[in-house]
């Protein structure tokens, strides 16, 4: 199978996307990979799979590659004798953050009739914005961590007790995130967060909370990852998350009861189906007093959370054959013809 990897984008997580994309070479070994890079100024470049490495992008060498245009049914190179389509079977969206997770890529792929693995438009909107994720969870009967919402031009007062954690609403990878232990630290933390976003959510910082990650998709049958208990530190900053996104070897399953595992997976399915059909997502959960709370939805997890699956590549192949399809609309202009006919008789 030929899989196009779309990565980069005009995003604060641009570099993490590059790391995720390079990692796919180690993971999708049986597939033919076609790399399509989106520069910070949103131009498309075809990248030589054999030559892809991080320096290619930091040095600007990627600009020597073929520039692509997006048209109906795919990406095309431009030449003296016309355009040539870039061949692939399915596109894997690996743009983290803005462009990739906010619905822009989903909209383009749908509009230009390109098969793709990624959340669709509505799912992107609900999972990219942490505030909307809270609303989604509430509508599904899934409990979340308590929160308050602050806007850049609004009041900076919070009512919950310290310590708290400040998160930009539309960012991942711990960018702009701070733990605030007292009121004296609040203004600075908000200044940092508002550098990246106009809205933040404030949540209680729960010291020593049990955290579990569950990834999966639906390919006609449920394909769920192991339940992972990630490394426990007070806070995983951007650097640690950056390294985390390059993982390519499977991790061990969390040592938890079968009942807790089943409850986490039932909650995951409730979130995934039907909104996230056609995508591989990861949900991060907290367990507090035996209660499962949704922390975040990762619509395009780092390196696609490949390390949580025993057969990630096989799953990608199966998912590519089970993607949701838009209904074709037949337009025959009957209404306009009837108006024209009526006018002709008048």
Swiss-Prot record:
Keywords attached to this entry: ATP-binding, Cell shape, Cell wall biogenesis/degradation, Cytoplasm, Ligase, Magnesium, Manganese, Metal-binding, Nucleotide-binding, Peptidoglycan synthesis
Cofactor(s) this protein requires: Mg(2+); Mn(2+)
Location in or out of the cell: Cytoplasm
Positions of Mg(2+) 2 binding: 296, 298
Main location: cytoplasm
GO biological process: cell wall organization; peptidoglycan biosynthetic process; regulation of cell shape
Disulfides per UniProt: none
Residue stretches making up the ATP-grasp domain: 134-340
SUPFAM superfamilies per record: Glutathione synthetase ATP-binding domain-like, PreATP-grasp domain
Cofactor binding annotation: Binds 2 magnesium or manganese ions per subunit.
Cellular compartments per GO CC: cytoplasm
Catalytic reactions on record: 2 D-alanine + ATP = D-alanyl-D-alanine + ADP + phosphate + H(+)
InterPro entries: ATP-grasp (IPR011761), ATP_grasp_subdomain_1 (IPR013815), D-Ala_lig_Van_CS (IPR000291), D_ala_D_ala (IPR005905), Dala_Dala_lig_C (IPR011095), Dala_Dala_lig_N (IPR011127), PreATP-grasp_dom_sf (IPR016185)
Pathway(s) of this molecule: Cell wall biogenesis; peptidoglycan biosynthesis
GO molecular function, one term: metal ion binding
Taxonomic superkingdom: Bacteria
Pfam family name, one: Dala_Dala_lig_C
Function in brief: Cell wall formation.
Entry's family note: Belongs to the D-alanine--D-alanine ligase family.
The protein, known as: D-alanine--D-alanine ligase
């Amino acid at each position: 199978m030929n899989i196009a990897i779309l990565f980069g984008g005009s995003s604060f997580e641009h570099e993490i996307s590059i790391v995720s994309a390079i990692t796919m070479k180690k993971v999708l070994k049986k597939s033919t990979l076609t790399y399509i890079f989106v520069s910070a100024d949103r131009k498309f470049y075809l990248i030589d799979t054999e030559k892809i490495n991080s320096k290619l992008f930091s040095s600007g060498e990627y600009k020597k590659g073929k520039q692509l245009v997006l048209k109906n049914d795919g990406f095309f190179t431009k030449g003296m004798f016309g355009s040539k389509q870039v061949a692939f079977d399915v596109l894997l969206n690996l743009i983290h953050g803005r462009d990739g997770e906010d619905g822009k890529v989903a909209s383009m792929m749908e509009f230009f009739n390109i098969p793709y693995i990624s959340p669709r438009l509505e799912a992107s909107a609900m999972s990219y914005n942490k505030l909307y994720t809270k609303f989604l969870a509430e509508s599904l009967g899934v409990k979340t961590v308590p929160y308050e919402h602050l806007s850049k031009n609004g009041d900076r007062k919070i009512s919950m007790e310290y310590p708290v954690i400040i998160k930009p609403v539309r960012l991942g990878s711990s960018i702009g995130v701070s733990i605030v232990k007292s009121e004296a630290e609040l203004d600075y933390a908000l200044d940092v967060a508002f550098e990246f976003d106009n809205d933040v959510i404030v949540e209680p910082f729960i010291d020593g909370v049990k955290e579990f990650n569950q990834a999966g998709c639906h390919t006609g049958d449920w394909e769920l990852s192991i339940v992972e208990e990630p490394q426990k530190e007070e806070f995983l900053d951007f650097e640690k998350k950056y390294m985390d996104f390059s993982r390519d070897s499977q991790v061990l399953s969390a040592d938890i009861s079968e009942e807790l595992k089943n409850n986490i997976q039932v909650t995951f399915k409730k979130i995934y189906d039907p909104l996230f059909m056609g995508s591989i997502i990861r949900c991060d959960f907290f367990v507090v007093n035996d209660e499962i709370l949704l922390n975040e939805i990762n619509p395009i997890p780092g390196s696609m959370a490949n390390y949580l699956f025993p057969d990630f590549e096989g799953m990608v192949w199966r998912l590519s054959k089970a993607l949701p399809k838009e209904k074709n609309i037949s337009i025959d202009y009957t209404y306009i013809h009837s108006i024209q006919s009526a006018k002709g008789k008048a």
